[in-house]
Amino acid sequence: MQYRPFGTTDFQVSALGFGAMRLPLRGPGASDIDEPQTVRMIRTAIDAGVNYVDTAFGYHGGQSEVVVGQALRDGYRHRIKLATKLPTWQVKAVDDFDTMLARQLGRLQTEHIDFYLLHNLNATYWPRMKDLGILERAERALR
């Protein structure tokens, strides 16, 4: 696996990451993820050197985070950097940040998220994020 510097951090990110937006399904429903196959896929990628896994609150109706959390059990979590995303369109009040973050930590079965991204941040949602102080809230969550 090839690795590259991740911005100005000390982290060397694998040239390939694992994105969990479209996972194998058992049936027609978007949240009906084939969990055993997905866990095998994620762990195979990590065993091959992938060290960046990306998911989001809304992927597969929220089930992507759950299955990613399952895949990262048994020692896999410490081998990767985990990214997920705050659904900016669902943030209506300042406390929504804490509620969403806690829910995502629970789904992912982890105590921390390495990269917490603002999902679908655009001209519509940016003013609300700014007015609610979401960036400051995120900085406080780092501590």
Predicted regions and their residues:
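Glycine/proline-rich, positively charged
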Residues: V91-R143
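Proline-rich low-complexity regions
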Residues: S14, P87-T88, R107
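Active-site mouth loops of central-metabolism enzymes
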Residues: R22-P36, K85-D95, T124-M129
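Structural motif corresponding to the early beta-alpha repeats
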Residues: Y59, G75-V94, H119-N122
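Conserved beta-strand positions
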Residues: F18, T55, T84, F115-L118
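Generic anion/oxyanion-binding catalytic loop in active/binding sites
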Residues: G27, F57, L86, A102-L105
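N-terminal binding-site loop/beta-alpha segment at the start of enzyme catalytic domains
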Residues: M1-I80, R137
